[in-house]
């Protein structure tokens, strides 16, 4: 009975297209600036110091696909490198290479930080900026200027302060991103942070997955248990 159950489970996982994006040991399958990215304590780790600051936003990029419709789950943890406690990062998805030699990408970003303002929002790196604040359901409409779309708030996904209160500092949190058609949803620790439908011609349909190291004060950000399930 056990072999049959195991085979059935493997078949269901194969059908769902579940892929572990990180082997827990090294940077196989990923590309980024080795000055900042490594594996520490079984996690993908981006680290900057006062002596070695990040000059511009740089990214660790998954090399093995540009998924369209998917669910991505992972755990992340942040540690400020000084008493300023400024630590900002994000998960890029449906993104594109902007400056490959500098490991710079642009596109949708599931934002998070050590502070209380930006975790859970939808930001578009190298693009249209903040597209949805935490706790909002938004429809993005075409504007006269493609870089300045009309953001129509159509509802709430929850209370922003309550969502923030459930995010742990100096510990692991779980992020989930669900992208299907022109709709994207983001969750932190099981709470829906944004629900966005992008009706513009600029809406990305597919693209790379990447993790951000933000320019600025010293910081450390870590990622593990990274699972991509494609439709």
Positions of PLM-derived features:
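Carbohydrate-interacting regions of secretory-pathway proteins
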Residues: 16-231
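Sec-dependent N-terminal signal peptides
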Residues: 3-13
């Amino acid at each position: 009975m056990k072999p049959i159950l195991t085979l059935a489970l493997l078949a269901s996982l194969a059908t769902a297209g579940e892929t572990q994006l990180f082997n827990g040991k090294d940077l196989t399958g990923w590309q980024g600036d080795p000055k900042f990215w490594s594996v520490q304590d079984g996690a993908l780790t981006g680290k900057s110091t006062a002596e070695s600051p990040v000059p511009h936003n740089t990214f660790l990029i998954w090399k093995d696909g540009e998924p369209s419709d998917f669910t991505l789950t992972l755990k992340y943890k942040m540690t400020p490198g000084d008493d300023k406690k400024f630590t900002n990062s994000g998960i890029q998805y449906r993104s594109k290479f902007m400056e490959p030699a500098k490991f710079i990408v642009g596109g949708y970003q599931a934002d998070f930080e050590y502070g209380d303002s930006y975790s859970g929002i939808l930001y578009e790196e190298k693009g249209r900026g903040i597209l949805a604040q935490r706790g909002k359901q938004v429809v993005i409409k075409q504007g006269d200027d493609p870089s300045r779309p009309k953001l129509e708030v159509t509802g709430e996904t929850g209370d922003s302060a309550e969502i923030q209160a459930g995010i742990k500092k100096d510990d692991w949190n779980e992020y989930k991103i669900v992208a299907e058609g022109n709709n994207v949803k983001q969750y932190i620790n099981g709470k829906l942070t944004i629900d966005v439908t992008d009706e513009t011609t600029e809406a990305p349909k597919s693209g790379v997955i990447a993790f951000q190291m933000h320019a600025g004060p010293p910081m450390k950000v870590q990622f593990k248990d990274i699972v991509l399930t494609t439709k």
